[in-house]
Amino acid sequence: MTPCGPEGSRVAPLPPRPEELLLVAFGAVPGALLRWLLQADPLANLLGCLVIGIVSGSEPPRPRAMLLVGIGFCGSLTTFSGWILALETAMGRGSLSGVALLLLELAAGVLAVVLGRGLAGRLARSRPRLRR
């Protein structure tokens, strides 16, 4: 993982600077507050997947938006640790329906990222092009 996205992403990594740390921090606070207000990890995770799909699918790539929204906001909104805890709890109880529900949530998250990237592409195509 690079500071701006997964390996091979279109977002070039930036050298860490105080400005970038502040972008991540400023994005993290509203993300964490929204997660707390929602009180629903699956909804928070799906919303975060949709948003990071939009940000990562933007053209041209926007490294600062990825720091603020992708890493800061979505990173604190979503919860991999909570998802794994729910999975382990369901498995410990022998709840196949609980495990199936969590796997469904995982698939929905992937679809939300794909949808977000598609929305970003549509938004990019609908913007008027500047002539040089």
Q: For the regions a protein language model found, what residue spans apply to each?
A:
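Membrane-interface helix-loop junctions in multi-pass transporters/channels
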Residues: M1-R132
